[in-house]
Curated annotation (Swiss-Prot):
Its EC number is 7.1.2.2. One of its GO terms (biological process) is proton motive force-driven plasma membrane ATP synthesis. It catalyses: ATP + H2O + 4 H(+)(in) = ADP + phosphate + 5 H(+)(out). It is an enzyme of class 7 (translocase). One of its GO terms (cellular component) is plasma membrane. It is found in: Cell membrane. This is A-type ATP synthase subunit A. The keyword Membrane applies.
Amino acid sequence: MAVKGKVLRVRGPVVIAEDMQGVQMYEVVEVGKDGLVGEVTRITGDKAVIQVYEDTTGITPGEPVVGTGSPFSVELGPGLLSHIFDGILRPLESIHEVAKSPFIKRGIKVPSLDRSKKWEWRPNPELKPGDKVSGDDILGTVPETPLIEHKVMVPPNVVPVDKAATLKWLAPAGEYTIEDTIAVVEYEGKEIELKMYHRWPIRRPRPVKEKFEPVTPLITGVRVLDTLFPMAKGGTGAIPGPFGSGKTVTLRTLAAWSDAKVVIYVGCGERGNEMTDVLVNFPHYKDPWSGRPLMERTILVANTSNMPVAAREASIYVGVTLAEYYRDMGYDSLLIADSTSRWAEALRDIAGRMEEMPAEEGFPPYLASRLAEYYERAGRARIPGRPERVGSVTIASAVSPPGGDFSEPVTSHTRRFVRVFWALDASLAYARHYPAINWLVSYSLYVDTVAKWWHENISPKWKEYRDEMMSILLKEDELKEIVRLVGPESLSEPDKLIIETARIIKEAFLQQNAFDPIDAFCSPKKQFLMMKIIIDFYRKAKELVNAGVPVATIREAVKEEVAELIRSRFTVRNEELEKLEDLYARFMEKLSSLSP
């Protein structure tokens, strides 16, 4: 029996309703005559506090509030990829067709998945009537896009992963809509019809069998990220930075070039023109791993700053639920959230309207636990169903601290829960050094875990070279103060070599043009070769300096090769690595000729 109450008070996106006996926490309710979507966030006696995911302008006391009896859930099934949704997973293209308007009308109800489209269903050949099935067992597959084969699973909220149901019937191969029954199972004496889609509550993590340490790097094609501060598949990372430092471009680079199988891009409370830019450009980008259009592996959730504040909070959970769903199929999914600061501001706004006690800078006291809930849904895991498979959810989120202050609550709490911290620096951005990742503040706790992959697939010397590159950059930072005070002439010859090598690292390796067709994506092999040239140059030059050869002489001898190395970012394609091998040989030859 649906709960029926009425509006008592309206405070922006928060509505207080009375006569709500029997309503449950996080239950979805329809508010007002237009049936606006809301979620119960607090219950006191017969009163319920509801956060509404649509504009509440014009709602008056006394209007009806009707419970739906279920928590806020999203539809999971074929038809999610290559589409754009709003913060509560309503497809924007369908809304545009129904509303005949560029704006989302209040109370509009459009299903997330297309009910009329027919999909090519292929049943699992290993299953037959009478077999026992559990939650997350694969019933069959659907080619959702040319890149992704959608695996239709037994919903774990219909048949638990630790229980068994009997398969009564499995649909033969053919074309079906998502509303057609594709299997019938008997569980606890009841026959249950299964369809290609099911609903899942966004605040509830999907079950896993066991979680593993992430050991495979997420290859992004960005040299400073892959080599100095690597992210692992199943890892968590944050990109904090002040206004204009390049957060959105860095995240877009991750979405476009990373080797994740499925990318969910959540624009949470950011500007509408940034989301428009993604929409305009992504269909033209090609996936570097397959050559297919990028949209075939991407889901976009647009929840811009002019959309209702409450929907920002939901959009983050919607995104991570989609990522977990594709992880359960055995894929590596990447969730990109831009930005969690706007999400935290939405929490602050709603908490203020609910008259909750504020904590630091007005944020609610539970900010840290909400951030922890979100980041803990990342990970590499074994999925409980059959056939056995392993998938991962990687989370990379932007943080927008006001004025670039990393001590503010959202950034400081985020640092506790993420293992990769890519700190963007306004001074580097203003100096046109992009990506503006500060190598002195940033860190990655996955360096040792992903080193094995680099050693087995690229070179056993990867970690040795990477650590030496970091130590050169750290030494150069110590020397910069001396150079500022007394000039570079006062430095010893070994210190001058550190300064010169650090300059080459910054110009040839750390800087990267996200809009150049060649430099936008740098393969792991090219990254290693460029690093090898720089570090072996430094080692050989150090021997010469110790033998009495001045740094000025070394610089003059290899100036053409250094210029060519810097140009190689734009001139050497990922499949033309013999050019870098040739450049390495010329470097060593020139340096050998200087031996006293």
